Amino acid sequence: MPITIGRGFLKSEMFSQSAISQRSFFTLLWEKIKDFFCDTQRSTADQYIKELCDVASPPDAQRLFDLFCKLYELSSPSCRGNFHFQHYKDAECQYTNLCIKDGEDIPLCIMIRQDHYYYEIMNRTVLCVDTQSAHLKRYSDINIKASTYVCEPLCCLFPERLQLSLSGGITFSVDLKNIEETLIAMAEKGNLCDWKEQERKAAISSRINLGIAQAGVTAIDDAIKNKIAAKVIENTNLKNAAFEPNYAQSSVTQIVYSCLFKNEILMNMLEESSSHGLLCLNELTEYVALQVHNSLFSEDLSSLVETTKNEAHHQS
């Protein structure tokens, strides 16, 4: 039966599996590829394969891509030729195939498209389709969805276009390539790693600070902020996260806002509609910024503001 996974708007349809068949499923795949890893790496590779074979809660597209890359990095140098990466793009479509081959057999094959993905393990298919769009919180008449693809320079799935559907049958998309190009330029200059370290701190801190502000609790000093932040970080399982009480906005949020603001079609739509304005632009910015953050760091911050608000009320 369909279940919601990943970022909350991916749907998965899969073959039903019993616990016994799932274990057998894992064993078959592991027996096929375990020799691709040296003894010191097999324990870690074993855990990644188990995650791949978890048909009850399959990984989303970004995690699939991450797992494939991790398995490649763990493999013995002499076996890396068994890992195949094929990326195709033209004016009409683009797709990425990630495969592990063993002679004529293909024990693992991952196919990633712009709006859906699926993967096969030992010729058993798990199909996951991006079928659900999201609604803006304040503007329920606007449906939004990010179309993603594999960005090789950044080594992640990256949002390529923002698709919007409005009441009255109006549909259009916003090109997000300027965001990607900005980050690729950093990578080419060798600045991306240092920037990402600061960006993650800013992204987490700014949303925690926003949640504290929206809670409307008075007399919160930096010590209380730090206490709230520590609890929120623990509850949301953000590994090795740091908090800065003075951060108000992340660089990604600024880059996304600039990209959307420069889109004439989007801005004309906002200006012509009496019910939409800069608040709508801010919500669109936050949606895209969350997708970009998830792409870069493989973590979902969408609940961070609400979690912080609840914790701030609890601490007051």
UniProtKB/Swiss-Prot annotation:
It is found in: Secreted; Host cytoplasm. Keywords: Host cytoplasm, Secreted, Virulence. Disulfide bonds: none annotated. InterPro entries: Sif (IPR010637). Induction: Induced when grown intracellularly and in an acidic environment; repressed by H-NS and induced by SsrB. It comes from the Bacteria. Gene3D superfamilies: 1.10.4120.20, Secreted effector protein SifA. One of its GO terms (cellular component) is extracellular region. Belongs to the Sif family. Effector proteins function to alter host cell physiology and promote bacterial survival in host tissues. NCBIfam families: PRK09499.1 (NF007046). This is Secreted effector protein SifB. It comes from Salmonella typhimurium (strain LT2 / SGSC1412 / ATCC 700720).
